Amino acid sequence: MASSFWKGVVGIGLFALAHAAFSAAQHRSYMRLTEKENETLPIDIVLQTLLSFVITCYGIVHISGEFKDMDASSELKNKTFDTLRNHPSFYLFNHRGRVLFRTPEQEPSTPNAQALPSNPLRLRKLENFH
């Protein structure tokens, strides 16, 4: 859990960033009124923007916690080889293998099934087993 100090730093940084944005918008509207549209932002607004951005990023880095290693071996060393690529949600038991490798004793005895021509692919696969 992040300490309240770093959350306060992020809050102050965001507040300063919002203040810099408001100051830049106010300066731009002032420049339009005085018809000096080609002027750049004053250095204090630019510095406040950059400093508040750095403070906010620094606080967020401390709030985020520990970073993970980029090396995958540190995370994979706790897993066995069997569980490495094991995805049980992709298991499918209702597939065409039951129909392709059915023995003649298991053929359905319905008149509809006998009226259909036999599957040549299934017969070729069964011939290889005999």
UniProtKB/Swiss-Prot annotation:
It is a multi-pass membrane protein. InterPro entries: MMgT. It is found in: Endoplasmic reticulum membrane; Golgi apparatus membrane; Early endosome membrane. GO terms for biological process: magnesium ion transport; protein insertion into ER membrane by stop-transfer membrane-anchor sequence; tail-anchored membrane protein insertion into ER membrane. Residues 1-3, 64-130 are cytoplasmic. The keyword Magnesium applies. GO terms for molecular function: inorganic cation transmembrane transporter activity; magnesium ion transmembrane transporter activity. Pfam families: MMgT. The keyword Ion transport does not apply. GO terms for cellular component: early endosome; early endosome membrane; EMC complex; endoplasmic reticulum membrane; Golgi apparatus; Golgi membrane; membrane; plasma membrane. Belongs to the membrane magnesium transporter (TC 1.A.67) family. Part of the endoplasmic reticulum membrane protein complex (EMC) that enables the energy-independent insertion into endoplasmic reticulum membranes of newly synthesized membrane proteins. Preferentially accommodates proteins with transmembrane domains that are weakly hydrophobic or contain destabilizing features such as charged and aromatic residues. Involved in the cotranslational insertion of multi-pass membrane proteins in which stop-transfer membrane-anchor sequences become ER membrane spanning helices. This is ER membrane protein complex subunit 5. It comes from Danio rerio (Zebrafish). The lineage of its organism: Eukaryota, Metazoa, Chordata, Craniata, Vertebrata.
